[in-house]
Design a protein with these regions (language model features):
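Active-site and adjacent substrate-binding regions of carbohydrate-active enzymes
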Residues: 1-435, 439-464
Length: 464
């Protein structure tokens, strides 16, 4: 999609029906006696209908345009050659300026059935902002893959024309529990990587972690594709907050809009402890690990943003029924001082698009920089150790199925063990096998004796 103030869209509005400018988007006549009804029943991601009506140049009510997200984001028609050429030039423009890759958002809704038929009715229990996901005429529509194949041709040709450049594209395709569907996006002629969100969408329990990791690993590793993990992103409450809730271990707390709308009480100390363990989990897995800004600081979700300061269109489109995702998008703190947005800006007189909490500076990079027990220190240690772990190869072996509260796997000479239970658990001998502690999620989480070794509750260890 593109901004509704973009020159191309403004030209399309001015050009009138049947113009080549309108063919770059999805303009259609409305239904009803005077075209007063939208062309079909499609729903927008952020609530409401997916169509908005324009006023024609002569001042009369006119055609409707399609917007999968908001009226300020009209959808491009990716079947249009002008659009294809525009993005070819855009990719090369940024590659010429040293950009090495692109993260491509919302790839699952780029394709459209050319006839734009009505979507099937959805169950009444489906949330207003989830109805769009059940539209088979845009979600995972096959024509989108033609666009990504073309992008890959552009990327490959650029590398040929510029020896030494290594470029990467990664897609954001929400396909939880459907690794075979995810594989479509990482075929050799499409994206280099595609986010695996199964861990992000898993509750805090070893059984769920095992199912999510094993399912993704078996599908992508066997296909020769790169596993691409994430625990946080811009669309979900931060993991420190999610893991700090009393129902964090339940799948029901992790489904649908609960990822962004839960207002259950949060135990931040518990959330931090679990988030530290989860960091070792995801950084121990083979493949690529993506860290969301502030994750390495252990930032919690900001839950008390005033309604007047909220920016997420979900909040406005649902008339405040859903708070949206603003709380994970608050500017990251770099310094202890509240000046210059805790170091986020170099300007002395700047207003943030989202207010920072008063204690944000105490969670900053500066406040954690020299603290060997901080979340930042843990990430630095883990990333340093990960360099050697990567040399062990991509093959891992899962130990158990998580029903004992342990999510465990071996990777070469390393072993990763995560205890999601509320009690210390004995580490099986097949995991220990002469190994010792390399790194713990915090001090004191690993103990060993003559006959047994234990991992503390809500903790993780790397052994080797």
């Amino acid at each position: 999609d593109v901004c509704s103030t973009d020159l191309w869209f403004q030209e399309a509005v001015d050009a009138g029906r049947g113009s080549k400018q309108r063919e770059r988007f999805w303009f259609r006549d409305g239904q009803g006696v005077n075209g007063e009804l939208p062309p079909n029943n499609w729903k927008a991601v952020f609530g409401g209908g997916a169509w908005s009506r324009i006023t024609e140049p002569d001042g009369t009510p006119g055609q409707w345009f399609l917007h999968t997200f908001t009226p300020w984001q009209p959808d491009f028609n990716w079947l249009n050659e002008d659009v294809v050429d525009y993005f070819d030039r855009m990719l090369r423009f940024w590659f010429d300026r040293g950009v090495d890759g692109f993260r491509v958002d919302a790839v699952t809704v780029v394709g459209k059935h050319p006839d734009l038929p009505d979507a099937p009715a959805v169950a009444s229990a489906v949330a207003e902002t989830d109805a769009w996901a059940f539209n088979p005429y845009t979600v995972f529509w096959p024509s989108a893959h033609d666009a990504w194949r073309h992008w890959r041709e552009v990327v490959n040709q650029y590398e040929i024309d510029h020896p030494g450049r290594e470029l990467v594209t990664v897609s954001e395709a929400y396909t939880p529990g459907k690794p075979d569907l995810l594989l479509r996006y990482v075929e050799p002629d499409q994206f280099h990587q595609s986010f695996t969100f199964d861990l992000l969408l898993s509750p805090w329990n070893a059984l769920s972690f095992h199912k999510a990791a094993a399912r993704s690993y078996q599908a992508l590793h066997n296909a020769g594709a790169t596993l691409t993990w994430a625990l946080n992103n811009h669309d979900a409450h931060r993991v420190v907050t999610r893991y700090g809730r009393a129902d964090a271990h339940l799948m029901s707390s992790w489904t649908g809009s609960n990822l962004v709308n839960s207002d259950a009480p949060v135990d931040l100390e518990l959330g931090h402890r679990r988030a530290r363990a989860a960091a070792l989990l995801v950084l121990g897995l083979p493949g690529a690990a993506y860290l969301y800004m502030g994750e390495e600081l252990g930032l919690p979700e900001v839950l008390d943003i005033p309604d007047s300061a909220r920016q997420d269109p979900i909040f406005a489109r649902t008339e405040g029924r859903e708070k949206g995702r603003d709380g994970c998008r608050v500017p990251m703190p770099w310094t202890n001082s509240s000046e210059r947005l805790a170091g986020f800006s170099t300007s002395a007189n700047v207003e943030s698009w989202m207010p920072q909490p008063e204690d944000w500076g105490s969670r900053s990079v500066e406040s954690q920089d020299d603290d060997c027990s901080s979340m930042l220190a843990l990430y630095r240690q883990a990333l340093s150790c990960r360099v050697d772990m990567v040399k062990q190869g991509e093959e891992i072996h899962f130990i158990g199925d998580g029903t004992d509260g342990l999510f465990s796997f071996t990777r070469g000479s390393y072993a990763v063990v995560v205890n999601t239970s509320e009690d210390a658990v004995e580490i099986p001998q097949e995991i220990m096998a002469g190994r010792g502690l390399i790194l713990g999620s915090q001090t004191g989480v690993f103990s060993t004796g003559e006959e047994a070794s234990y991992i503390a509750a809500n903790s993780a260890v790397w052994l080797g």
